[in-house]
Amino acid sequence: MAVAAAETRVFLEVRRRLQSALLILGGPDEGGMHLDISITPTSLLVRTPDGCTEIRLPAGVRLVPSSCGGLQYISGDGLHLRLRVQAESSPQPISVFNQSLQAQECCTFYCQSCGEVTIKDRKLLRVLPLPSENWSALVGEWCCHPDPFANRPLHPRENDCFIGDSFFLVNLKSDLEQEPKANTKVICKRCKVTLGETMSSETTKFYMTEVIIRPSEGSFPNIPRSQFLQSIIAQCLVELSSARSTFRFTIQGQDGKVYILLWVLNSDSLVIEPLRSSSCSRKFPLLESSLEAGSGSAWNAIKVLYQPCIKSRNKELASSWEGDISVHPLTLPSATCLELLLILSRNNASLPLSLRQMNSFQVAFLKM
């Protein structure tokens, strides 16, 4: 097939559960150059007089060329095409609980932003998940008796690590020269980023988005901040959605202020990046920040709807969500909430125009 276009921009999303794919080839409305599209089961090739753009599908994903349908041109957006795919089911997500922490291991805690060691060579004898943060509200709503553990926080012992929705609780009594005050921030000595807060004289909360935990014999993994934050948040959302059958979340700061309303649409998306070379006409902005030139890649991602709540935006909707027991709160440092909002906004701006909004919400992908 051939259409008139210039400076082709390629977007390809594969839905594993639906066994379908959406292909969008963007270009200006008027003028342009000749564009040819070749589709095979394992690749997609877009040729123009100036060069070509190629998308190679990862193992386990195959297009069905004969199923091309729904062809339409949307002004200001580009050529839309839907295909059937043969795709293996989504890989089972690795639990945030088990990815970094295993009982009996000697671990080191690092600041994710700069690599500064926060806790060195800590042997963890028990790694246990905590009850849900809104457990008391659930008991009050569904049980005929009061919560027997109300106002009785769980504190880890010296070699324990308790896992919350978005944080780790550890006992730092043996690591500190003087007894810390409760409800004070834990700041990285090198980069001054907020890593967590003290809950009592012995218990410290570290946020998963700020700390990397690795076996002590290993080294600090230098992961780009945006990639790390997207991965951690995406995994948390997938786990909470699966475990508690909730798909709506309020992202709030340590002060309780709501920054983002987030609604998980699906977790089976595969977003595929075209190979890039000097002859290729355009990069795919959603992924380019974390890939090297000349490479191609595919990312598992979750698709979310979101609404920002900063500067009193969406105040009534935020109040409604906060009062809804089916909406789960996720607490992060205030600076991280703003980081996440910036990532969502950038990812939204990189999507084709027709995909950027759904009803009154904005759309974005978070890479797993």
Curated annotation (Swiss-Prot):
The record's comment about this protein's domains reads: The C-terminal half (AA 188-389) is able to bind cyclin-B and shows a self-ubiquitination activity (mono-, poly, or multi-ubiquitination) in a HECT-like sequence dependent manner.
Which GO molecular function annotation, any one, does this entry have? ribonuclease inhibitor activity
Residues that bear N-acetylalanine:
A2
Name the reaction it catalyses: S-ubiquitinyl-[E2 ubiquitin-conjugating enzyme]-L-cysteine + [acceptor protein]-L-lysine = [E2 ubiquitin-conjugating enzyme]-L-cysteine + N(6)-ubiquitinyl-[acceptor protein]-L-lysine
- PTMs? Ubiquitinated by UBCH10 (E2 ubiquitin-conjugating enzyme).
Role noted for this protein: E3 ubiquitin-protein ligase which accepts ubiquitin from specific E2 ubiquitin-conjugating enzymes, and transfers it to substrates, generally promoting their degradation by the proteasome. Independently of its E3 ubiquitin-protein ligase activity, acts as an inhibitor of CPSF3 endonuclease activity by blocking CPSF3 active site.
Q: Where in the cell is it found?
A: Cytoplasm
Q: Which domain of life is it from?
A: Eukaryota
Pathway participation: Protein modification; protein ubiquitination
Q: Principal place where this protein is found? A: cytoplasm
Residue ranges, annotated region (Interaction with UBE2C):
214-236
UniProt source species: Mus musculus
Please identify the protein, giving its name as recorded.
Answer: E3 ubiquitin-protein ligase E3D
Q: Where is this region: HECT-like?
A: 332-368
